[in-house]
Amino acid sequence: MENRRETLLLQITGQLNHMTAAIPRGPKSAFRKVLLGTDNVRGLAELILDHTIKAISKGTGLTTAGEGLAIEMNKLTTFNLKSGTDRKVKYALISAGVEAFGSLKSLSYIDKVTERQGVMKLNKLDFISEDNLLFYYFEEQLTISELELPKEDYTYWTHPRKDGRTIVKKMPKSLTSQYTHTKMPRVYAALNAYGSTKFKVNEELLSVLMQMDEDKHMFIPKTIDSEEVSGALYSLMKFRRISEFVGEQAKKWYLANVSQQLMKKGLTTVQIDGRSKKYSKRKASGWFKEKTSEPLDLVRASSKRYEFDKVTFMARRMRNKTFHYDFQLDSRGRMYPVVNYFEPTGSDVAKGLLIFKNGVPVSDNVLYNLAIHTANCMGEDKLAMEDRVLFVWVHMDEILEAAENLTNSEWLNQFKSEKKTKFQLIAAVLEWKKYHEQGEDYVCHLPIGLDATNSGLQVLSAVTRDVIGAQETNVINHPDQEIGDAYMVIANSVLDNGFAYNNYEELDSKAWRKLCKRPTMSYYYDAGRECIQEQTYDDRRDHGVDVLSRMTFDDASYVGTAIYDGVESAFPRQTQAKEALKAGVEEALRNNGGKALVTWKTASGFTAFQDYSRIETGRVNCSFAGKLVQLSFQLFIDKPMKSDHSKGISANFVHSQDAALLSLTIANLAEKGVKSFMMIHDQFSVNAEETSLLLETFKETFIEIFEEDQLGDTLRAFGLQTNPVGYGDLDIQDVMEAKYIIS
């Protein structure tokens, strides 16, 4: 690989030197100015090679890939590509990046291709031939660029910029001063504590997965033929076009058959037309959902296989190494790793393949927490803690028997429906095997996770001081049962409202709980009725209930509407908070001078923002290997999309609060000496000896944040003088007694 890379770099460097020598006098393109302003042509060649591999492997559009390459090239030249208006900067970056990619076209390695996506066209890079040096190098890389792998060394965040990245993704220039270490020291502490965590690959699990893949085990995503995927994508585009016709016909039927009845009820022509459009949209959406179910399943299966291959290949590349992950923040303050796929917030496979470099020796506490983690992975996370431990020890003989032959274990196969944890379960089973083999010499490297109970509802219950919501999400102990269950509260709300349809009301409580889980979470992130209807249909096969798997879209629409109404009425204060946030952001926009950027502070010191701007389309002329190429791009204009602001504020506020909770929990744990973290927004993992410390610190941090009026402070920051939400009488100090706030 090194020989091929070096040969390619020599060729690209030679081509760039040739282009520099051939630059004429007079006006020059942005890329030619980059060449004249650099003394590191070799560095430019490396960027061009790595970004080409990255763009082709990800299927990135040419404008996006070109802009990304140019941003990196700008660091190696005295010519500033980022000088001028936003539109001029966009022109310069795209044209410079595209012309740079053209150097590989001149070497007969790549070309620009146009891919149709419905009515849209996407320009991308692809190989001219699969019989050339660049393609062979690409194959050796197996689509993983060196840019995408975890790093063996960690560089601390000390300023808002590091290694060419900003601490906040898409950081507005006007807010740069808000993200200094002085303004948010505990956020920096959290980022660096997480980033300095030492990870290694779970070698035992990786070997098991490779054997399972070879044996075509049911846990492993199947390989889908590329022609099948192409056919499925074509079908999706065809069905999308036909669905528009279905909607038009539905509207005609509605107006012909229903409009007279509505007119007799006193509705105006405008109101009737509005209803006909809504009916048309629902019919078109339902037809499209049902017709596209099979091709979508095929595309999703292909994506799962693609992800599995990426994760396992990256894990093989990192074998026998100690490595770190670098993190950036999003606009809410949530942490996201720079690396994709094989990373701590990724899929079940990725999480299972990651273990801490620094383990802890066996103790009663380690075994207790390993048992809880194992039970959680087995889907028994609603049992009391002691019962989870007992459950695992009762099944220990089966666990150890399965560990001897995981690829052929009937016991293990019963967990095939545990979409989120089956590979982490295998990792836990392997730990029990090691413990029983090694005894007192056993050292546990497995991250042990405690999950929040519906984090969004927890946050909204805390900020509105709602006792019922806090009990049902385990923010405080439940007075009548061991563990609160908000999803069953929603299910009972639906059934108590007189729901009766297709005998679904006869389903057991477990099925109803599954039906209500995702819609409940989505509702508090401001999902509307239509979204919840679609989720109900999309998830119909995931519940393990035959009658639900046979749902039509009309069935799902009826059930989804009932669930939406049930959620809305079950926790009224939380719904009030959503509406208050919408009123607040509307007030902020009225007083914002026509600007799109809206900000608020969180308890961590982070300045959260949402910036839903209007979009304009522009065109830029580029040179690609001497030929003129015209490309389209999108440019955000600093004028607000008010409807998007209104839709987004509930989710963004809640996520900003859980982000502050995560950051401060990590920072507080680091101060107490914890050195290994594996955190995922509302899932908190440390080593098996420190979960009790994690729980206590989490509760202390929760109180620290929510004893202040986070909702009221945010509404006042938006300019809303009166808080319309009627708070409950939750005593936030009761959180310290909570046993299951994370479990």
Segments predicted by a language model, with ranges:
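Active-site palm subdomain of RNA-directed nucleic acid polymerases
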Residues: D658-I680
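Short Gly/Ser/Thr- and Asp/Glu-enriched loop/turn motifs at secondary-structure junctions
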Residues: S331-R332, M679-Q683
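Short cationic amphipathic helices and targeting signals
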Residues: P337, D682-V686
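Catalytic palm subdomain of template-directed nucleic-acid polymerases
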Residues: S685-E700
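Short, contiguous acidic/charged loop-to-helix segments that flank catalytic cores in large enzymes
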Residues: G648-Q657, S685
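Non-catalytic nucleic-acid-binding interfaces of large nucleic-acid enzymes and RNP effectors
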Residues: M1-T520, Y524-N652, N668, K672, ...
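Short, surface-exposed charged micro-motifs
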Residues: D326, S676, Q683
